[in-house]
Design a protein with these regions (language model features):
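Sequence/structural segment immediately N-terminal to covalent heme-attachment motifs in c-type
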Residues: 37-58, 64-72, 168, 178-208, ...
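Extended non-catalytic domains of envelope/secretory-pathway proteins
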Residues: 38, 191, 202, 208, ...
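Intrinsic disorder/low-complexity detector
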Residues: 28-39, 149-182, 287-323, 417-431
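Bacterial N-terminal signal peptides
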Residues: 8-18
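Bacterial N-terminal signal peptides that target proteins for export
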Residues: 1-9
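Boundary at the C-terminal end of the N-terminal hydrophobic targeting segment
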Residues: 21-23
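Axial heme c-ligation environment in periplasmic c-type cytochrome domains
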Residues: 77-93, 98, 104-129, 150-151, ...
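Hydrophobic, ordered structural segments
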Residues: 97, 101-116, 120-193, 197, ...
């Protein structure tokens, strides 16, 4: 059985760890009257679920556990294997002893050494009881699927698998977990869950020259490296040491979000398939263990209290980064950086925003984001990728985000964006001729103060003109992003068509009259005096948006 676990891809702004029950611990509660065989299979399903087997061994659109999922590594491409009980292409002919050897030593019945993308160095810590339960579940409960495994595409010398035997000799300890008598039972359990089937270190522990994890536990002189953070496949797996409060970590693993952050990338799938199904006792054990680890020398302290959303920064409308944020980000993340609870994450105090390494932030900005689908949050919210923006624009916006609302992280450079774009090769879907105006370019206008104020009157109409708006609408409620979105009633070129004939009025109307028509009807309010500074500023913004339209 060839496991090629996608642990290296399953990371985002926060943590990834999965549960495996201690041999001395009872399995999850089962229905009254269950037979021993049923109890074993239920426990096996739980172990498989908490080990996130589905995420790695089920290709997109593929059969359950039938493999075929692509995993790109620095050495080449490998594919997850078929772990259904099919006797020809799966694991249907494996004895328990053969299965156990694969899981602990990474060696198949045919003597083939597996690549350590399959985290057998961690699985070696599993108890025999849990290993037998997992074996029983895979062979008796998972439907057999006949699907031939795909060959790995690894370059020389990594395609010489005999070298993996030496790697195993140097770095793999195949002995089960041993509790530390100096630790409490909950901490021992948490350590067992994190270090064993959870294989949290596969993503969150730094790697050495031979691509080995620098530590497999927090013990010994190398223990300071354990879970200290690593960059994997253009994602930054943050340090898990001394993580938040126990309650906050439990909430994140259960729901995909807490008051500090929201998971991203493939971690959303991990939450969906795996960690939301953990028992509360197991989640608490994991969180307690992570909290007990002393922070690393480069770790920023995890906040114990969520940041209170601040007012919009003073430079929101006076810098290119601030205006870029206003145009492309503020609708969801709000001018105060507070986001929308349960939907869009806060940016103030968010560890993924303030991390010294901006890898994940760049990844999300270029390719997009989605929330985890969980029982607590069944609706998935998404963020589009912004690869259509130029590298310097993205750098300006992210630098603004990383230094606003109390955030104090280094700025982002265009060179960093360029490098990430080359690595990800993100695809854009904009095939129209519409060119989105950039609000940041307002600052280059001869009348910059006037047109920026005009833009704000469209964006913050209710707040800035309370005597003229009778409901809660802003101009941008209908004309998205201050009239800059292609399919959101844009303002581009509009002023060139005024004065124009209005059938409703039966006469030619000016742009000022058309604006006041919105105040009267759409906003149930009062018109602006045509010669007022506010009206002149709104018209100036329309004139700036005319662009090249004649």
């Amino acid at each position: 059985m060839v496991f090629n676990i996608r642990c290296l891809a399953a990371v985002g702004l926060t943590l990834f760890c999965t549960y495996q029950a201690h041999a001395s611990e009872p399995p999850p509660a089962t229905a009254e009257g269950s037979t021993p065989a049923q109890t074993l299979l239920e426990r096996g399903k739980y172990v498989a679920q908490l080990g996130d087997c589905i995420a790695c061994h089920t290709a997109k659109g593929g059969a359950l556990m039938a493999g075929g999922l692509e995993l790109k590594t620095p050495m080449g491409t490998i594919y997850s294997s078929n772990i259904t009980p099919d006797v020809d292409t799966g694991i249907g002919q494996y004895s328990f002893e053969q299965f156990d050897r694969v899981m602990r030593e990474g060696v198949t019945p045919a003597g083939l050494n597996l690549y350590p993308a399959m985290p057998y160095p961690s699985y070696a810590k599993m108890s025999e009881d849990d290993m037998r339960a997992l074996y029983a579940y895979l062979l008796q409960e998972v439907p057999a699927v006949k699907l031939t495994n795909l060959e790995a595409d690894m370059g020389f010398p990594f395609n010489q698998r005999w070298g993996l035997a030496l790697w195993n000799w140097a770095f793999v300890d195949n002995q089960p977990f041993t509790p530390d008598p100096a630790k409490t039972e909950p901490l021992n359990r948490g350590a067992y869950l994190v270090q064993g089937l959870g294989h949290c270190g596969s993503c969150h522990t730094p790697r050495g020259m031979a691509f080995q994890e620098k530590a497999m536990s927090d013990a010994g002189s190398s223990g300071k490296h354990y879970l200290a953070g690593e960059t994997v496949e253009e994602w930054r797996a943050l340090s898990l040491r001394n993580l938040w409060t126990v309650e906050d970590t439990v909430q994140l693993l259960k729901t995909g979000q807490n008051r500090f952050a929201t998971v991203s990338g493939n971690m959303a799938d991990v939450i969906h398939h795996s960690t939301q199904h953990f028992t509360d006792a197991d989640l608490t054990a994991i969180a307690s263990y992570l909290k007990s680890l002393p922070p690393g020398k480069d770790d920023l302290p995890m906040p114990a209290v969520a940041s209170v959303p601040a007012v919009a920064p003073d430079n929101l409308f006076s810098t290119r980064g601030g205006l870029g944020y206003t145009q492309f980000c503020a609708d969801c993340h709000r001018p105060d950086g507070g986001g929308v609870k349960g939907m869009f994450p806060p940016l103030n105090g968010n560890p993924g925003i303030t991390a010294a390494n901006p890898t994940s932030l760049l990844h999300i900005t270029l390719t997009g984001w989605k929330t985890a689908e969980t029982a607590a949050h069944p609706r998935v919210y998404t963020m589009p990728g912004f690869a259509r923006l130029a590298d310097d624009e993205i750098a300006e916006i992210l630098s603004f985000v990383r230094t606003s609302w109390g955030n104090d992280a280094p700025g982002t450079t265009a060179a960093q964006v360029t490098k990430m774009r080359q690595q990800l090769n993100p695809q854009t879907t904009d095939s129209t001729a519409f060119v989105t105006p950039r609000l940041a370019n307002l600052l280059a206008a001869a009348n910059a103060d006037q047109v920026v104020r005009g833009m704000r009157l469209h964006l913050q109409t209710k707040a800035l003109l309370p005597n003229n708006v009778g409901n809660a609408l802003n101009c941008t409620s209908c004309h998205l992003n201050a009239g800059t979105v292609a399919d959101g009633s844009p303002f581009v070129g509009v002023s060139a068509f005024f004065p124009s004939y209005a059938p409703r009025a039966g006469k030619d109307v000016t742009l000022e009259e058309r604006i006041n028509g919105c105040f009267r009807r759409s906003m149930a309010g009062k018109p602006l005096p045509v010669t007022s500074p506010d009206m002149q500023e709104m018209v100036a913004y329309f004139e700036w948006m005319k662009m090249n339209t004649q």
